[in-house]
């Protein structure tokens, strides 16, 4: 049976189909040429020398093309212009060394022209083991046995054929005017065209027909030169690999800070110094006379003021101090920091903003106390009154001055004074270390309790903060396991056993905390591409540094150099594709940016830019458009565009307009509509989704293309990443440990990978090449193409189909691993929605963030239009960059995958700041919940929170007011934790009056997925609430008075304080005879000397005298009028007005009770400074307490408080036995409960009613080592 010869699938000779079929695309002739150094080989029967030449690859041309990119071009002053008008130096001196070497090579080749023909035998290299006629590779040119290896024979043949003359950059033309004609193979110069043809024939080539045309060689040279120094082909140095961790971390927050000083935020300050009369100086009771240090100030008046960390010894200043001046000075600035722009130049503050400013002050109070109490060691006290107690050793040279303050019972004196009496009543053994040894198992104990001066509020705040960090604490074994999981096992992390347990490593974080922080990041991106682009660029740089894949464009040029073309062709497919893939005017980082985009397909959609599509839709008859289609078809599967499949289909449909017609169901989106316009699911043609609607007769190519897309488009997959059990997961719409991929993922080869042609992207490329071959073979679509051009195009596609690029295998095996390794450590964790391939119903159409719960919206301002944020950023990529990377990837020759990744990944996981992103997520979550809690105090958000400060005036904050308040909260949080970049900025725009954060994404079929992260408990918000509850009872300590004030003349010699007035001077709305001046009241002045009358709130006309009640707002709006009309009545005492304040800052003016004092000047000045937007601090005139008898003078008071507001008074005449005249106050034993009450438990506190000033403080001896000191990584 006669075997049917197989039709050639390789290169055509340029004159139609070859009559002689070959199975190896000219490889037999190549071996023959290399073995036979005697010149042109013997042709087979029926094949001319010209036809045989056309089937041979140009080995010399290939080598010259690859070598020429490495040497500079030597141009003569004169030359022949090429097709583009560029002049090349093609003239060589007759007596040059190049000519001599070329002639020598030519003569060497001519010696063997008479050698006999090589034998012919059969081989089984054909398809289906078909024996085809081919030259034997085991015989030499004489017919004898040849035992040399093929590689040796090829090298010898090449050295004989190719000149040793250094190659030039670019191939000069073969013809020249002037001095001669130069051979582009060996650089020999001939003197006529006939001599040149004969010379070229000695190379086995012909002057007009070459296997690699000069046009291709020129484009190869330009292609290689353009790529030579491009950043995408540069391999990162080891030094640069050590900097990879810098791309992973933002600012490291100051989460753990230590304070070795006193744990107190309330300071006892002397207000009025002690006054000693001369006649009793000899009988002084002052302990200072005996050089005894007192635990309390020795003064006539001492008060408690807020001063955070006034006795601290910290390692880092959070710069959030709240320092309140003594009440004898003006503290109004503390209550006008927020929302008081119009009052900055006056000495007043807006009373409607008091609550917001108080909340901000309380937040600063909490933030400045987020310290851990440092364990500093103990030493036994040798003084007699402590019974050998172990007292804490303080660092610093001035430690001694603090002991009397820390331990009041160390003092002992027989003097009689309020201080001494207090010390004598204390429980002596409640001092120093309590109930725990200092050393445990030979090391300092992990924590210890100590009795010392401290305030209960600060102790509680620091205790809660320590408990929060303790919940985040993880042991080295957990870190070892978690890092190994995150590194996918490529880095061996070990945790050496150590007996010490005094480690504090707060790195554990919950999923909910990471999800809330993730939503904040997503809101920050919104629709702004400038925010996400740097993120993707950093990840692309990181991928380039850790990836073994190297982009080597010479793989493309070497492949194209083997394409057979005719120099007489007007079009060159190989040259055209090389020109398309040059890096000019393109961002060739797009390949790895596309990979980075896989991590964020929920917030950014990577699309192919419009410039990559065929111009004006293109035409199938255009070679340029065909290559645009090829480049586009290869690049589209790597994007995250869910409409990429239909864009690929419509790109070819655009080019087939006029040749093939498909049914389009939309009058606007027709077949001629640009493919890039099909960017939403509703534009998908029905014929694409149901390919049976495409006629295989009327549109065979488009039907084939649709079938290819449906069958061979890459399938999505997933890979495991992270350690959510320890580090949490920010995934919102996917399981915690899942990373989605748009292509199939296969396990990576842990040793040395080999070339694989079975992966999805290689199959996809092969199908695209086959489709294009069908296009060029059909004369219907290419009526103007010659058979030579068709053959050349088919050959080019075959080369591209089988190009030896490692990129497709890398994308399927190693790229997912790289993404999974870096994803857990990124500052912006992956945000993904499921990839849908060709399922239009599941295409995501909307991703949005909601700030407000629909069930709790009570104001029109809280509409969804202002609280929703729609997310979505399109990011255009260059298809040429992606295609170049797909076609030119290679691995290092000695690559061992697991060893490579161990070296590349280790610097990331050995960095000391590897956990900074986790800690930032925790702080972000704390800040969000704190903001929600605080905003709910000044606006009606229906958020369930205790409102302890409702008695402080406040307006109902609008969105703008709440945004200003939120901005201050954000600034305070960033300052306290030493952060410089984004924290709560996304919430500052729009309406920050939020109650919850939720995120939704909607599919095209209408299905919606909602994720509402559960708000975990916020320690900072809880501490602010605790401080607010304490403030509700101890407001005087913070410089605020509660209740109203009464303005009226009261003259008396009784030395009472207006902060605690006699009850008979106070009246309210329920007091008989009291009139109320309401908003609608009117004053009617009397005629002919009659007293003025006022229509009160009940509508009755009454004389303007007696007791009246005015709302503060009414007085502010009519301050000028009231000041002019009422001052005379007030000064005479005929009129007393109660102004309803609610809360107000105050200022004390002490006077000598032995001298006459009148407070009218203070009162009138205060009334004059009231404006519609502000009130100053209310002035009170207070007598100085005296420890001896005095002769009291009358005092005239004009402003008194309606409630007791003297809780900040600590003691009067503390160094004396008693107070004789004026306000009297002993040292408050209720604030020293555990020191004065032996029945009180040692750990008892009286918050929120009373702030204890002596407590048990827990101090810690934890270490906070860097990660490198806890675990060891073995690369």
UniProtKB/Swiss-Prot annotation:
ZnF region ranges: C2H2-type: 181-203
Where does it localize?
Virion
Name recorded for this polypeptide: Inner capsid protein lambda-1
Q: Which cofactor is recorded for it?
A: Mg(2+); Mn(2+)
Biased composition of type Basic and acidic residues is found at 18-35, 75-117
Q: Does the keyword Hydrolase apply?
A: yes
Query: What subunit structure does UniProt give?
Result: Homodecamer; each decamer is made up of two conformers of VP2, called VP2A and VP2B. 12 homodecamers assemble to form an icosahedral capsid. Interacts with protein mu-NS; in viral inclusions.
EC numbers: 3.6.4.13
Cellular component per GO? viral inner capsid
Single biological process term from Gene Ontology:
7-methylguanosine mRNA capping
Q: Which family does it belong to?
A: Belongs to the turreted BTV-fold inner capsid family.
Listed Polar residues bias regions = 118-149
Q: Where are the transmembrane segments?
A: none
Basic residues biased stretches: 1-12
Keywords per UniProt? ATP-binding, Capsid protein, Helicase, Hydrolase, Inner capsid protein, Metal-binding, mRNA capping, mRNA processing, Nucleotide-binding, T=2 icosahedral capsid protein, Virion, Zinc, Zinc-finger
What PROSITE patterns does this protein's entry cite?
ZINC_FINGER_C2H2_1
Catalytic activity reads: ATP + H2O = ADP + phosphate + H(+)
What is this protein's gene name?
L3
């Amino acid at each position: 049976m006669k075997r049917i010869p197989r039709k050639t699938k390789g290169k055509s000779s340029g004159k139609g189909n070859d009559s002689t079929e070959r199975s190896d695309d000219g490889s037999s002739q190549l071996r023959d040429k290399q073995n036979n150094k005697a010149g042109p080989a013997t042709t087979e029967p029926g094949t001319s020398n010209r036809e045989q030449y056309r089937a041979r690859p140009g080995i010399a041309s290939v080598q010259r093309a690859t070598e020429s990119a490495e040497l500079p071009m030597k141009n003569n002053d004169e030359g022949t212009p090429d097709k583009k008008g560029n002049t090349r130096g093609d003239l060589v001196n007759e007596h040059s060394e190049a000519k001599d070497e070329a002639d020598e090579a030519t003569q060497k080749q001519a010696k063997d022209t008479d050698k006999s023909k090589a034998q012919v035998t059969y081989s089984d290299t054909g398809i289906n083991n078909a024996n085809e006629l081919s030259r034997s590779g085991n015989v030499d040119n004489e017919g004898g046995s040849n035992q040399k290896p093929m590689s040796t024979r090829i090298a010898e043949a090449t050295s004989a054929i190719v000149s040793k003359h250094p190659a030039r950059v670019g191939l000069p033309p073969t013809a020249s005017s002037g001095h001669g004609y130069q051979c582009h193979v060996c650089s020999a110069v001939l003197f006529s065209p006939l001599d040149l043809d004969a010379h070229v024939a000695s190379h086995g080539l012909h002057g007009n027909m070459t296997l690699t045309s000069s046009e291709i060689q020129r484009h190869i040279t330009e292609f290689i030169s353009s790529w030579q120094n491009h950043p995408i082909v540069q391999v990162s140095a080891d030094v640069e690999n050590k900097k990879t961790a810098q791309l992973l971390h933002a600012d490291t927050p100051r989460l753990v800070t230590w304070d070795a000083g006193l744990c107190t935020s309330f300071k006892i300050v002397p207000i009025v110094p002690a006054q000693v009369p001369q006649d009793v100086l000899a009988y002084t009771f002052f302990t200072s006379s005996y050089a005894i240090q007192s635990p309390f100030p020795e003064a006539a008046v001492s008060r408690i003021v807020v001063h955070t960390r006034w006795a601290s010894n910290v390692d880092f200043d959070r710069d959030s101090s709240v320092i309140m001046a003594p009440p004898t000075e003006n503290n109004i600035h503390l209550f006008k920091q927020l929302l008081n722009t119009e009052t900055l130049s006056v000495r007043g503050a807006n009373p409607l903003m008091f609550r917001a400013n108080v909340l901000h002050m309380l937040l600063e109070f909490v933030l400045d106390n987020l310290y851990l109490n440092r364990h500093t060691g103990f030493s036994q006290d040798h003084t007699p009154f402590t019974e050998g107690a172990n007292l804490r050793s303080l660092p610093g040279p001035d430690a001694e001055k603090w002991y009397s303050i820390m331990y009041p019972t160390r003092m002992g004196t027989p003097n009689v004074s309020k201080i001494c009496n207090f010390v004598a009543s204390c429980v002596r053994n409640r001092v120093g270390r309590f109930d725990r040894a200092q050393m445990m198992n030979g090391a300092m104990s992990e924590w210890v309790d100590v009795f010392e001066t401290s305030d209960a509020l600060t102790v509680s705040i620091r205790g809660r903060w320590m408990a929060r960090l303790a919940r985040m604490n993880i042991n080295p074994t957990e870190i070892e396991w978690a890092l190994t999981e995150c590194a996918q096992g490529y880095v061996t992390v070990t945790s050496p056993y150590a007996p010490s347990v005094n480690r504090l490593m707060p790195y554990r974080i919950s999923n909910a905390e990471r999800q809330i922080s993730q939503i904040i990041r997503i809101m920050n991106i919104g629709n702004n591409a400038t925010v996400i682009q740097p993120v993707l660029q950093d990840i692309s740089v990181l991928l380039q540094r850790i990836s073994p894949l190297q982009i080597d464009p010479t793989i493309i040029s070497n492949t194209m150099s083997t394409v057979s073309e005719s120099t007489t062709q007007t079009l060159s497919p190989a040259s055209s594709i090389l020109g398309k893939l040059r890096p000019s005017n393109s961002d060739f980082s797009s390949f790895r940016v596309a990979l980075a985009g896989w991590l964020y397909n929920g917030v950014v959609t990577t699309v192919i830019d419009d410039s990559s599509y065929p111009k004006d839709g293109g035409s199938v008859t255009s070679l340029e458009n065909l290559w645009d289609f090829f480049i586009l078809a290869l690049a589209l599967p790597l994007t995250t565009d869910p409409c990429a499949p239909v864009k690929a289909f419509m790109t070819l449909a655009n080019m087939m307009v006029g040749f093939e017609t498909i049914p389009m169901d939309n009058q606007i989106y027709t077949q001629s509509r640009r493919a890039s316009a099909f960017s939403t699911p509703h534009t998908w043609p029905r014929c694409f989704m149901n390919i049976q609607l495409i006629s295989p007769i009327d549109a065979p190519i488009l039907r084939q293309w649709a079938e290819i897309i449906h069958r061979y488009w890459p399938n999505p997959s997933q890979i495991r990443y992270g350690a959510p059990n320890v580090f949490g997961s920010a995934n919102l719409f996917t399981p915690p440990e899942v990373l989605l991929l748009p292509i199939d993922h296969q396990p990576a080869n842990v040793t040395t990978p080999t070339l694989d042609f079975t992966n999805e992207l290689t199959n996809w490329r092969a199908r695209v090449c086959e489709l294009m071959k069908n296009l060029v073979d059909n004369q219907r679509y290419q009526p103007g193409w010659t058979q030579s051009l068709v053959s050349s195009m088919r050959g080019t596609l075959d080369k591209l189909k089988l190009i030896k690029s490692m990129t497709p295998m890398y994308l399927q095996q190693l790229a997912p691993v790289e993404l999974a390794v870096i994803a857990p450590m990124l500052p912006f964790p992956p945000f993904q929605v499921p990839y849908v391939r060709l399922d239009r119903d599941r295409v995501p159409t909307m991703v949005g963030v909601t700030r407000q719960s629909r069930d709790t919206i009570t104001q029109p301002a809280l509409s969804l239009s202002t609280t929703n944020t729609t997310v979505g950023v399109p990011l255009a990529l260059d298809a040429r960059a992606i295609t170049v990377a797909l076609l030119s990837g290679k691995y290092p020759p000695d690559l061992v995958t697991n060893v490579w990744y161990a070296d590349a990944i280790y610097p990331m996981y050995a960095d000391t700041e590897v956990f900074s992103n986790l800690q930032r997520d925790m702080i972000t979550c704390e800040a969000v919940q704190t903001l929600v809690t605080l905003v709910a105090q000044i606006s009606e958000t229906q958020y369930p929170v205790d409102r302890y400060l409702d008695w402080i005036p406040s307006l109902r904050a609008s969105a703008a007011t709440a945004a200003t308040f939120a901005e201050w909260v954000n600034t305070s949080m960033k300052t306290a934790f030493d952060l410089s970049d984004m924290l709560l900025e996304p919430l500052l725009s729009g309406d920050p009056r939020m109650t919850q954060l939720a995120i939704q994404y909607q599919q095209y079929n209408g299905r919606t997925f909602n994720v509402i992260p559960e708000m975990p408990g916020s320690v900072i918000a809880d501490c602010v609430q605790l401080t607010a509850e304490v403030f509700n009872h101890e407001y005087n300590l913070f410089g605020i008075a509660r209740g109203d004030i009464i303005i009226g003349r009261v003259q008396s010699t009784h030395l009472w304080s207006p902060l605690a007035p006699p009850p008979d001077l106070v009246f309210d709305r329920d007091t008989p005879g009291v009139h109320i001046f309401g908003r609608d009241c009117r004053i009617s002045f009397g005629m002919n000397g009659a007293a003025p009358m006022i229509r009160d709130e009940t509508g009755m006309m009454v004389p303007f005298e007696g007791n009246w009640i005015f709302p503060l707002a009414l007085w502010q709006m009519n301050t000028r009028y009231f000041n002019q009309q009422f001052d005379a009545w007030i000064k005479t005492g005929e009129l007393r007005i109660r102004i309803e304040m609610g809360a107000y800052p105050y200022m004390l003016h002490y006077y000598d009770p032995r001298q006459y004092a009148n407070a009218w000047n203070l009162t009138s000045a205060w009334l004059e400074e009231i404006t519609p937007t502000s009130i100053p601090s209310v002035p009170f005139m207070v007598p100085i307490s005296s420890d001896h008898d005095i002769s009291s003078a009358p005092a005239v008071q004009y402003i008194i408080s309606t409630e007791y507001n003297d809780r900040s008074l600590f003691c009067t005449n503390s160094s004396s036995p008693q107070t004789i005249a004026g306000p009297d106050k002993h040292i408050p034993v209720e604030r020293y409960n555990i020191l004065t009450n032996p029945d009180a438990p040692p750990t008892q506190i009286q918050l929120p009613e009373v702030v204890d000033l002596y407590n048990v403080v827990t101090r810690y001896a934890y270490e906070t080592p860097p990660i490198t000191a806890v675990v060891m990584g073995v690369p």
